[in-house]
Curated annotation (Swiss-Prot):
Organism: Lactococcus lactis subsp. cremoris (Streptococcus cremoris)
GO cellular component: cytoplasm
Similarity comment text for this entry: Belongs to the aspartate/ornithine carbamoyltransferase superfamily. OTCase family.
GO biological process: arginine biosynthetic process via ornithine; arginine catabolic process to ornithine; citrulline biosynthetic process
Pathway named in the protein's UniProt entry: Amino-acid degradation; L-arginine degradation via ADI pathway; carbamoyl phosphate from L-arginine: step 2/2
Summary of the function given for this chain in its UniProt record: Reversibly catalyzes the transfer of the carbamoyl group from carbamoyl phosphate (CP) to the N(epsilon) atom of ornithine (ORN) to produce L-citrulline.
Keywords, in A-Z order: Arginine metabolism, Cytoplasm, Transferase
Localisation per UniProt entry: Cytoplasm
Gene3D superfamilies assigned to the protein according to its UniProt record, in alphabetical order: Aspartate/ornithine carbamoyltransferase
PANTHER family attached to this UniProt entry: ORNITHINE CARBAMOYLTRANSFERASE, CATABOLIC (PTHR45753:SF1), ORNITHINE CARBAMOYLTRANSFERASE, MITOCHONDRIAL (PTHR45753)
Protein name per its UniProtKB record: Ornithine carbamoyltransferase, catabolic
Record-level Gene Ontology MF annotations: amino acid binding; ornithine carbamoyltransferase activity
Protein EC: 2.1.3.3
NCBIfam families in alphabetical order: orni_carb_tr
Length: 354
């Protein structure tokens, strides 16, 4: 009796050929594996050990939004892995305007081995994956930011040595993609994620339902609250993001609503961990912590504020890990790219992790 045909990818890797569109597309164990793989690749980079897992591959980088960290991370990660990255910006490619997303996906899939997309619509990135026939990586949409999550939890694991049982508190706009991704990913990995925000800016019921479903298995305790003291108590990680994205019109309303939620040294003291080495601050950047930017000057002129989501004192303090976190974007993206495109031998991932 002949054996059924089994492809190399099926034997060798649980990741090969897969897209990362949202964190929930992968299992908690797979997300943790990517975190650990990112740490491994970071060590190889620091020791100048080559890791050309994507030699000869061509990768399309599609950007509808401006980007510093995501573009730089994907570009350097691809080059380190031996691949050729090709940047296509908003003026180069306009999905759904002159050509449908389906048609564009089919064309790009015939020329490139994988596609990264940083844009607005989650459906758009899902359609790219559906029709291109190659792995697609979500570099950010309005709903999710999965590549950021691997970097973030890499940073947490670097600082604490483990994930399960830690408490990460996100303070600010609880409806944005960062809050969505943090509470879902944390619940997958056994991290207690608290969203501390005004009631009108709490995560949607759909997002909380996803988080709670994962939390039932991991033991995490996700929470959304407007009470700052309750929300930050016991925090190991205080996390922030910008209050208003560039191009949005409701600055005044949002600034008034969120000013009480600015991260200060006093807020860090409320955690109870400010003096025992069990607290760090993280921010996905860019941050409005001073007036050294055009936007910072505009905010000061309009609202009289020299700081927004975080004070300059916290941003420059011993707790701050935002630049380490930013560097980890490259290593984590490298892990995602290599795992899903590199034909690596990963037949299974450990279900138990800490």
């Amino acid at each position: 009796m002949t054996s059924p045909l089994i492809t190399k990818a099926e034997v060798n890797s649980v990741f090969q050929g897969r897209s990362l569109l949202a964190e929930k597309d992968f299992t908690p164990a797979e997300i943790n594996y990517l975190v650990d793989f990112g740490l491994h690749l970071k060590a190889l980079k620091q020791q100048n050990i080559p890791h050309h897992y994507l030699e000869g591959k061509n990768i399309a980088l599609l950007f509808a939004k401006t980007s510093t960290r995501t573009r730089a991370a994907f570009t350097t990660a691809a080059i380190d892995l031996g691949a050729h990255p090709e940047y296509l910006g908003a003026n180069d490619i306009q999905l759904g305007i002159k050509e449908s997303t389906e048609d564009t996906a089919r064309v790009l899939g015939s020329m490139f081995d994988a596609i990264e997309r940083r844009g607005f619509s989650q459906k758009e990135v899902e359609d790219l994956a559906k029709y291109s026939g190659v792995p697609v990586w979500n570099g950010l949409t309005d709903d999710w930011h999965p590549t950021q999550m691997i970097a973030d939890f890499m940073t947490v694991k670097e600082n604490f040595g483990y994930l399960k049982g830690l408490t990460l508190v996100y303070v600010g706009d609880g409806r944005n993609n960062m809050a969505n991704s943090l509470i879902v990913t944390g619940s997958m990995l056994g991290v207690n994620v608290h969203i501390v925000a005004p009631d009108s800016l709490h995560p949607s019921k759909e997002v909380m339902d996803i988080a709670n479903k994962f939390a039932e298995k991991s033991g995490a305790k996700p929470l959304a609250t407007s009470n700052i003291e309750e929300g930050v108590k016991g925090a190991n990680i205080i996390y922030s993001d910008v209050w208003v994205s560039m191009g949005e019109s409701n600055w005044e309303e949002r600034v008034k609503l969120l000013t009480p939620y600015r991260i200060t040294m006093d807020m860090l003291k409320m955690t109870g961990n400010a003096d025992n080495g069990k607290l760090i601050f993280m921010h996905c950047l860019p941050a409005f912590h001073d007036t050294e930017t055009e936007y910072g000057k505009e905010i000061k002129e309009k609202y009289g504020l020299t700081e927004m989501e975080v004070t300059d004192a916290v941003f420059r303090s011993k707790y701050a890990r935002q630049f380490e976190e930013a560097e980890n974007r490259m290593h984590s993206i490298k892990a995602i790219m290599a795992a899903t495109l590199g034909n690596l031998f990963i037949p299974a991932v450990p279900e138990d992790f800490k």
